Amino acid sequence: MSLGIKEHPDAEVQKNRVLTLDDWQDKWVTRHIAFHQEQGHQLLKKHFDTFLKGQSGLRVFFPLCGKAIEMKWFADRGHTVVGVEISEIGIREFFAEQNLSYTEEPLTEIAGAKVFKSSSGNISLYCCSIFDLPRANIGKFDRIWDRGALVAVNPGDRDRYADIILSLLRKGYHYLLVVLSYDPTKHTGPPFYVPDAELKKLFGTKCNMQCLEEVDALEERHKTWGVDYFFEKLYLLTEK
C-alpha cells in the first residue's frame, strides 16, 4: 500500500550529524531508549511468514540489535540469531527479560569487545561497534532484519554500513529493512530520514528492492520533535 509519500527536498540537511558510540551507550545508561519496542515490530509480525518463506534453520542477523524481542521470535522457531550492539546493558537486559541463561567471553579479534551466547547456543550477541564486526568472522546470513540500524547510523557512515551488510549476505538472502520519512529540517535525528534515492544508491546495484508497505507511524513523542508526519517504509531486498 502506497501512501503517496513524497521525498523531502532537504534530504542533505542531516548529512553532517554525528553521534559517537559513547552517545549511544549513554542513551542506555540514562534510559533514553524510546526506540525499543516492547511488543516487537508490527510490520515484522505481519510479514513474518513472507520473510521466512517456510524455510528452517536460517541464520538471521540483527544489526544494532539493542534488546529486540524479535530475536527470540526467530530463535524459538529454530533459527540461529546473531546480533551486534554497542551497549552491554542492552545485551544483558535482553537475556534477563527473555529469561535466557547465557555465557560471555572476550573477543580476541576486537579489543574490549565481548560475545554473549545463550546457553541453548542459537543466540550470539556481539558487544562492539558494527564497524569492527568484520574482524570477528561471523559468517554469512540468510536473513537480515534491520528496523533501527540504517536509520541510526550516522549519515556519513552509511556507505561503510551498507558495505558491511552486503558482505554478510548469503546467496538467496532476504534483507528486510525499515526506513523513515519525515521532515529532516524539523528533527536532527537519530533516527535519521533515509530517502528512497539514498537507498537505491546504497543497495540498488546489488539488490532488487521492493517496498512492501508504508504506514503512518506518527506518535505523540514524534510531535514533540516538531514533525507533523512520520512514516515507516518496509523494504524487502533480495539478490539480483
Swiss-Prot record:
Similarity remark: Belongs to the class I-like SAM-binding methyltransferase superfamily. TPMT family.
Organism: Rattus norvegicus
HAMAP family, A to Z: Thiopur_methtran
Job description of the protein: Catalyzes the S-methylation of thiopurine drugs such as 6-mercaptopurine (also called mercaptopurine, 6-MP or its brand name Purinethol) using S-adenosyl-L-methionine as the methyl donor. TPMT activity modulates the cytotoxic effects of thiopurine prodrugs. A natural substrate for this enzyme has yet to be identified.
Xref: InterPro entries: SAM-dependent_MTases_sf, Thiopurine_S-MeTrfase, TPMT
GO-annotated cellular components: cytoplasm
Positions of post-translational N6-acetyllysine modification: K53
Gene Ontology annotations of biological process type: methylation; response to testosterone; xenobiotic metabolic process
GO molecular function, one term: S-adenosyl-L-methionine binding
Keywords: Acetylation, Cytoplasm, Methyltransferase, S-adenosyl-L-methionine, Transferase
Enzyme Commission number: 2.1.1.67
Sequence positions that bind substrate: F35
Phylogenetic lineage: Eukaryota, Metazoa, Chordata, Craniata, Vertebrata
Protein name, per record: Thiopurine S-methyltransferase
Subcellular location: Cytoplasm
PROSITE patterns registered for this protein in UniProt: SAM_MT_TPMT
Subunit note: Monomer.
Catalytic activities: S-adenosyl-L-methionine + a thiopurine = S-adenosyl-L-homocysteine + a thiopurine S-methylether; mercaptopurine + S-adenosyl-L-methionine = 6-methylthiopurine + S-adenosyl-L-homocysteine + H(+)
Residue numbers binding S-adenosyl-L-methionine: 24-35, 64, 85, 129-130, 147
